[in-house]
Amino acid sequence: ALCPLLTDGAIEALLTAGSDELKATYLEKLVSGQWTGTMNLTEPQAGSDLAAVRTRAEPQPDGSYKIFGTKIFITWGEHDMAENIIHLVLARVVGAPEGVKGISLFVVPKFMVKPDGNPGARNDVHCVSIEHKMGIKASPTAVLQFGDHGGAVGYLVGQENRGLEYMFIMMNAARYGVGVQGIAIAQMAYQKAVAFARDRVQSRPVDGSLKAAGPIIHHPDVK
């Protein structure tokens, strides 16, 4: 569920703030599921303090940016279950204001997109490790390195220095999804507990209503 959840957030961010060119390049295949999306905020030295983001973006003559930095705890940050991964990355344009007021949002594809719309050459973004987690093991959580070989190509979403505003579009979508996921997990846990209690035979009721051991669901502590 986490992979389409994040992809949906990327779709919403591009629909809201992306240029016509970005929409034409990425939306169709994100919506179809051929490509997946990620959300890149957290950094090793900053944690969730986005004011301390150091990933930098250097403007290029063609209107693109070169992205340099490290992002951690990236859900579905690396996998081969889709043709391309479209990373939405918070970074600071060189010379931007300090703090959260100087953060911008960029599209950084795993593979560059060719004129025919298909994935082309590998972009300069690489997975350097996968987290070993206690749970949610079907979802790869990655550390991503941008720009080790000259700079990852990124494309500005919306306007410079408004990245946090745009990222909240993704974050709010994710919050709704995680809330629904929590309700679903709790409901499933309850159903399994009830089924177990109905099948588990454990001693006779203290009120003597049964002569032999019965299901533990009749125990006062379980009722």
Features from the language model and the residues they span:
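Active-site lining segments that contact anionic ligands and/or coordinate catalytic metals
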Residues: 34-36, 52-54, 62, 84-86, ...
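Internal helix-loop-helix
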Residues: 1-28, 32-33, 82-86, 97
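Alpha-helical interface subdomain recognition
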Residues: 1-5, 9, 17-18, 32-33, ...
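Short Pro/Gly-enriched beta-strand edge/turn motifs at strand-loop
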Residues: 35-41, 70, 123-129
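A glycine-rich, basic-preceded beta-loop-alpha segment at the flavin cofactor/substrate interface
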Residues: 73, 113-128, 133, 140-174, ...
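Flexible, glycine/threonine-enriched loop-and-boundary segments that flank and lead into catalytic domains
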Residues: 38-79
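A short core secondary-structure module
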Residues: 64-122
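Short Gly/Pro-enriched turn/cap motifs at secondary-structure boundaries
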Residues: 45-48, 78-80, 97, 133-140
